[in-house]
Design a protein with these regions (language model features):
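Domain-level signal for soluble alpha/beta catalytic cores
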Residues: 1-173
């Protein structure tokens, strides 16, 4: 889906997004302190059930569970070398839910890295853009219909994610 197609869809109807994925995963037994994406890949049935329930309740857009699946967050768990495969598998899981229900779109989900930008931290703006580009390239390859940037604590980091998206693809953000 490109930005024009998304705008047409948005003009035709109110689009309903999915719900509190993290909260529901914790209610389903995900312990605190684990990598959520790794937990989901080890408990695919929990995520698939949650996402199909969202779609059956009328959700139009599922957020692929790629929320913190960027290099910096994955590094906290020693999983940064798994970025490509984890993002591919997580998007595939959401696409499976859409296929099983026969409707819906999958949004690649991006959030903050947890690192402060210079001068408050060591991370340079261009490095941050590159970190988002790395994940977005995989999300596009995996077949996301659009991208979402959420739960950001910094306008600069939000800007970096949007710039990265616009440099990589024509997907709606």
């Amino acid at each position: 889906m490109n930005k024009h197609e998304f705008r047409q869809l948005f003009d035709e109807k109110i689009l309903i997004l999915d719900g509190a994925t993290g909260t529901n995963l914790m209610n389903a037994g995900m312990p605190l302190g684990v990598c959520p994406e790794k937990y989901i890949l080890e408990h695919k049935e929990v995520m698939l059930e949650l996402q199909t329930s969202y779609l059956n309740a009328g959700t139009d857009i599922l957020y692929a569970p790629t929320f913190t699946c960027n290099r910096l967050k994955l590094r906290e768990y020693g999983l940064e070398n798994n970025l490509y495969q984890m993002n591919m598998d997580l998007v595939a899981l959401s696409k499976q839910a859409v296929a099983e229900c026969g409707h819906g779109y999958v949004a690649g989900d991006l959030t903050m890295t947890g690192e402060m930008l210079y001068p408050m931290g060591k991370l340079q703006f261009e490095e941050l853009v590159d970190i988002y580009k790395e994940q977005i390239k995989v999300l596009v390859e995996a077949g996301c219909d659009l991208l979402v940037v959420e739960t950001m604590m910094s306008l600069a980091e939000t800007r970096a994610a949007v710039i990265a998206a616009n440099e990589i693809c024509d997907l709606p953000v």
